[in-house]
């Protein structure tokens, strides 16, 4: 297999990557390209779908150029993507009728709020496993159909198509031949019935979204179509695996057994537990979602979404310029000598699970005249660990399963100080993946399995290499005191609600 490889297209919130893996799961090529973010109004976040497509083509080309690998050597392509982000495009021209509305965007919040006010929150939760929120695709589709002239009528005539990023890229790579999504991405739309495994007619009627614009839903590991030769340098290569980024990371962490939990520290942080072949509906504001469907079976998951994680470190660097780079934050935390009396609650876009408070805003507590730059940076890092504990504690309540080990990956997982504090505040062993590219690797595994590049899950397990572990060192009294302080800070943050004065409005 040395002359054959698997490519993963990892389309994230701020950049796109094309990564080529060999049979041992080693990364042999990696090309990355950022693309613009658009903020038309406060709280709105949009992308240009064609800029994403161009970034994908560019990274594919660069991966081949830099590695010397030929397109014909690629056995299969896996796609993993930022979830929920919504695109509606013209079926004939392939042109989007509006920018992609990003998962972070709050412009559709009034639609979600009206659904809750009208009493539909429980129905949506029971059918989809999700809370009713602007985070998911359903309200974004409705907003586009409402705000683009003639869009509703065109959608009803079958002239428009909807897709999350996976569907858009698959449609483009196959030259418009394949309009398909996978179980994991469908389960994040707030339109998919996770019990029946089909689009939910009641919710479609409720939101007046025409079923004709929705993609076919298929498993996470199968051949959906082949690249057009003009998009892949003369080669028609199977696109053979797809999964939303957090489910791909779960698969890349080889979390095949129920009760296995992983946390990916990216722009946000996403804690996901494999709950097996039956959906476990949360009583505590976690999301019930589909982990992956493979080999005729569907595996479900509980998920806690934290909106701000790595972006808090970016804020330290770019927003208030307390650090020059992400590694500086670890050095600063080690140099802090206070008694952890400072708490930063980074609710820059509200609070995610388990609070789901879209009106909360970031806050700081415990400042004194003696507080230093290092103390503030340390408190910001600690917020990532505290938020993770919020979700893990909730996950244990919902599932009834103890969590002896938390598998971690993502950029902030490189921070040894943070990982040790995470172990301490959870009183749980932290296992950092040897290969932190678990999202792309999960997509590659799904793609490779369906084309026979890897034979089965056992072969993947046999290749697993453990990473670095962090064991708890903090005493129970200190752990309890610190977490109680965090809980008090969150409660105080939720009390403060104020609309700023804007002159002229």
Curated annotation (Swiss-Prot):
CDD domains: FGGY_EcGK_like. It comes from the Bacteria. Its EC number is 2.7.1.30. The keyword Nucleotide-binding applies. InterPro entries: ATPase_NBD, Carb_kinase_FGGY, Carb_kinase_FGGY_CS, FGGY_C, FGGY_N, Glycerol_kin. The phosphoenolpyruvate-dependent sugar phosphotransferase system (PTS), including enzyme I, and histidine-containing protein (HPr) are required for the phosphorylation, which leads to the activation of the enzyme. Pathway: Polyol metabolism; glycerol degradation via glycerol kinase pathway; sn-glycerol 3-phosphate from glycerol: step 1/1. Activated by phosphorylation and inhibited by fructose 1,6-bisphosphate (FBP). It is an enzyme of class 2 (transferase). ADP binds at residues 13, 17, 267, 310, 411, 415. The modification Phosphohistidine is found at residue 231. Belongs to the FGGY kinase family. Homotetramer and homodimer (in equilibrium). Key enzyme in the regulation of glycerol uptake and metabolism. Catalyzes the phosphorylation of glycerol to yield sn-glycerol 3-phosphate. This is Glycerol kinase 1. It comes from Lactiplantibacillus plantarum (strain ATCC BAA-793 / NCIMB 8826 / WCFS1) (Lactobacillus plantarum).
């Amino acid at each position: 297999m040395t002359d054959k490889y698997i490519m993963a297209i990892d389309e994230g919130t701020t950049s796109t990557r094309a990564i080529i893996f060999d049979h041992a799961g080693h990364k042999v090529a990696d090309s990355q390209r950022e693309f613009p973010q658009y903020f038309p109004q406060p709280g709105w976040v949009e992308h240009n779908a064609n800029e994403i497509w161009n970034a994908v083509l560019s990274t594919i080309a660069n991966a081949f150029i830099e590695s010397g690998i030929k397109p014909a050597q690629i056995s299969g392509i896996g796609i993993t993507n930022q979830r929920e982000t919504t695109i509606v495009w013209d079926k004939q021209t392939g042109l989007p009728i509006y920018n992609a509305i990003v998962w972070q965007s709050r412009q559709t919040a009034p639609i979600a709020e009206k659904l809750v006010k009208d009493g539909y929150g429980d129905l949506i939760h029971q059918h989809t496993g999700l809370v009713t929120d602007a985070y998911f695709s359903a309200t974004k589709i409705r907003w586009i159909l409402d705000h683009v002239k003639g869009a509703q009528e065109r959608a009803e005539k079958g002239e428009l198509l909807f897709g999350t990023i996976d569907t858009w890229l698959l449609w483009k790579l196959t030259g418009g031949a394949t309009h398909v999504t996978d179980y994991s991405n469908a389960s994040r739309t707030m339109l998919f019935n996770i019990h029946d495994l089909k689009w939910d007619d009641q919710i479609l009627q409720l939101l007046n979204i025409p079923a004709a614009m929705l993609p076919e839903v298929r498993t996470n590991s199968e051949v959906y179509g082949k690249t057009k030769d003009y998009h892949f340098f003369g080669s028609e290569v199977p696109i053979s695996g797809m999964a939303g980024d957090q489910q791909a990371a779960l698969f890349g962490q080889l979390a095949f057994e129920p009760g296995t939990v992983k946390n990916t520290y990216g722009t946000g942080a996403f804690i996901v537990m494999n709950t097996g072949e039956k959906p476990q509906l949360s009583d505590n504001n976690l999301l019930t979602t589909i982990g992956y469907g493979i080999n005729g079976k569907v595996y479900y998951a509980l998920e806690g979404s934290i909106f701000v994680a790595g972006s808090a470190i970016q804020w330290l660097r770019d927003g208030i310029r307390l650090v020059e780079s992400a590694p500086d934050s670890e050095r600063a935390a080690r140099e802090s000598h206070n008694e952890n009396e400072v708490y930063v609650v980074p609710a820059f876009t509200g609070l995610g699970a388990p609070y789901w408070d879209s009106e909360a805003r970031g806050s700081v507590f415990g400042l004194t005249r003696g507080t230093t730059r290092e103390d503030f940076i340390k408190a910001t890092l600690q917020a990532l660990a505290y938020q993770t504990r919020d979700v893990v504690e909730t996950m244990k309540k919902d599932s009834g399963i103890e969590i002896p080990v938390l598998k971690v990956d993502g950029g902030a997982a490189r921070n040894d100080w943070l990982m040790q504090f995470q172990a301490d505040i959870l009183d749980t062993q932290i296992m950092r993946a040897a290969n932190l590219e678990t999202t792309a690797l999960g997509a590659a595994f799904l793609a490779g399995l369906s084309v026979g590049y890897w034979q089965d899950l056992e072969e993947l397990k046999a290749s697993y290499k453990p990473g670095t572990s962090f064991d708890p060192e903090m005493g129970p009294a200190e752990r309890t005191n610190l977490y109680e302080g965090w809980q008090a800070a969150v409660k105080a943050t939720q009390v403060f609600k104020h609309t700023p004065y804007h002159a002229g409005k």
